[in-house]
Amino acid sequence: MPEVADTCSLASPASVCRTQHLHLRCSVDFARRALTGTAALTVQSQEDNLRSLTLDTKDLTIEKVVINGQEVKYTLGESQGYKGSPMEISLPIALSKNQEVVIEISFETSPKSSALQWLTPEQTSGKQHPYLFSQCQAIHCRAILPCQDTPSVKLTYTAEVSVPKELVALMSAIRDGEAPDPEDPSRKIYRFNQRVPIPCYLIALVVGALESRQIGPRTLVWSEKEQVEKSAYEFSETESMLKIAEDLGGPYVWGQYDLLVLPPSFPYGGMENPCLTFVTPTLLAGDKSLSNVIAHEISHSWTGNLVTNKTWDHFWLNEGHTVYLERHICGRLFGEKFRHFHALGGWGELQNTIKTFGESHPFTKLVVDLKDVDPDVAYSSIPYEKGFALLFYLEQLLGGPEVFLGFLKAYVEKFSYQSVTTDDWKSFLYAHFKDKVDLLNQVDWNAWLYAPGLPPVKPNYDVTLTNACIALSQRWVTAKEEDLNSFSIEDLKDLSSHQLNEFLAQVLQKAPLPLGHIKRMQEVYNFNAINNSEIRFRWLRLCIQSKWEEAIPLALKMATEQGRMKFTRPLFKDLAAFDKSHDQAVRTYQEHKACMHPVTAMLVGKDLKVD
């Protein structure tokens, strides 16, 4: 497979050298908000006469670099903003092709590391102990340790992490024991081993007052004790989802599949860290209705973690295939009509995102060009939903779900433990369906892959479960003031929480509604009392876009009490666009930003045009 440049990394590319293994020894210092330690990187030269190599770093302090017991020279280049600073290391002897060297780097992270959020005890559920978690995707691993911070390089890792003894450390690896810290009796060392090679964006660490409960033969759910029972209930379907995923993708190679429920500031719905999926507590709806996120993270164990996008330009390969698998898992559990219902909801989400960006915006392309673009800034639902739409369209073109799932399983088998580009994927698609090349040649590949805006074709969707949502939303959107008395709580009696959410998504596409309509909707449906995060989010957006002043404190509360960017960013944007709440939104952001996740704080700041 030809070399493609990773414009998001300043390190030597995989064609020059490859990190094969990391041994991390570090200590977590809550008082100084720093990780201090050594990263021993086993690097294999990919060419003859290699005399130096470059690693990614970001806001790191480097103490020294040691090779074969000798300190060696290194230079830290100028900072290049979100990309960090290249670190060039001189090798004491030139390496020949395939020769390995162990480079031991002593480093310390910055309190402002973009990869880490340090929480005070007050920011936790238990209020007694501090908490730390990492989020490396896409390019923040370099803000924890020097590395080739590119998904084109995969490595195994082992780690020893020293933490205060009343706390627990977990990583994206198999737990490998714990022992008192010989250097400090008030601390404990936790050991970890990840034997499957992974891109370094999947390295993850959490430290806190964590407890666990077993919910399946290979699954513990971890959280602070205040959430552990609720989480065990919410995610009880995990093992049945894993079994379906293995049926669709092949054997689960990672051993353990644990779940970690994080504090509310965690910026994503979930993060597929191997052996330990991280999830937002906003999934704790009480009725398992948001468990599709678990199906999504489980699916990444194949698409993303085994078969990985070679650069972030091809992120859709990770996310499109993962959404495709996720919806098949939910289809197996809840029926094919349910799969189509979520697929169609995803098309609506795609329309919304394209409308927000503008239909000619380069970030609405499936394959993006991230040269001089921070992947966090480009991040959106496009790679998920445009990617899914392409695969769903191909499923229908090529003979249905069973046929296309056969392709997906073969794709995973072919490219496991590798990193791939869109061209690799497309070549394999053509090879797998060599008897259907005529059909494949009907696809407008250029439009699907490289053009902005909506895809050239909309797939076919079963609308059975969506129809009720559309019908009720139409009634509201077309209602005159004198019609408002015709609505009652009976309207909702046959709708699932998924359908209620879709109803609000449909109405939101037509926002603003007259204020009288919104007040009447609250009067008959009492949406303010609903705690399901997805439903509450769409309801509050509808209220603010329709200029209901009474909703301002509720929207501000939701935007700040949790930090999942899917919710926080649009809520802040809507509040800033409403004259009655603009100043309050900016003020609230400025008051809260010091205790927000660093990436969330940066992006909300951009959204609000402050800083």
Curated annotation (Swiss-Prot):
Give me the reactions it catalyses: leukotriene A4 + H2O = leukotriene B4; (5S,6S)-epoxy-(18R)-hydroxy-(7E,9E,11Z,14Z,16E)-eicosapentaenoate + H2O = resolvin E1; (5S,6S)-epoxy-(18S)-hydroxy-(7E,9E,11Z,14Z,16E)-eicosapentaenoate + H2O = 18S-resolvin E1; Release of the N-terminal residue from a tripeptide
Give the site residues for Covalently modified during suicide inhibition by leukotrienes: 379
Q: Which cofactor does it need?
A: Zn(2+)
Pfam families attached here? Leuk-A4-hydro_C, Peptidase_M1, Peptidase_M1_N
Q: What is its EC number?
A: 3.3.2.6, 3.4.11.4
Annotated compartments: Cytoplasm
GO cellular-component term (any): nucleoplasm
What is the protein name for this chain? Leukotriene A-4 hydrolase
Protein family membership: Belongs to the peptidase M1 family.
Q: Oligomeric state and partners?
A: Monomer.
**Record note on modification:** Phosphorylation at Ser-416 inhibits leukotriene-A4 hydrolase activity.
Which pathway, per its entry?
Lipid metabolism; leukotriene B4 biosynthesis
Q: Which UniProt keywords apply?
A: Acetylation, Cytoplasm, Hydrolase, Leukotriene biosynthesis, Metal-binding, Metalloprotease, Phosphoprotein, Protease, Zinc
Q: Report the co-factor binding details.
A: Binds 1 zinc ion per subunit.
A biological-process GO annotation: type I pneumocyte differentiation
Q: Please name the NCBIfam families in this protein's record.
A: leuko_A4_hydro
Name the PANTHER family on file.
LEUKOTRIENE A-4 HYDROLASE
Task: Show the InterPro entries listed in the entry.
Answer: Aminopeptidase_N-like_N (IPR045357), Aminopeptidase_N-like_N_sf (IPR042097), ARM-type_fold (IPR016024), LTA4H (IPR012777), LTA4H_cat (IPR049980), M1_LTA-4_hydro/amino_C_sf (IPR038502), M1_LTA4H (IPR034015), Peptidase_M1 (IPR001930)
Asked if the Swiss-Prot or TrEMBL record annotates the protein with the keyword Metal-binding, the reply is yes
Positions bound to a peptide: 135-137, 267-272, 564-566
Residues carrying Phosphoserine: 416
* Description of how activity is regulated: Inhibited by bestatin. Inhibited by captopril. The epoxide hydrolase activity is restrained by suicide inactivation that involves binding of LTA4 to Tyr-379. 4-(4-benzylphenyl)thiazol-2-amine (ARM1) selectively inhibits the epoxide hydrolase activity.
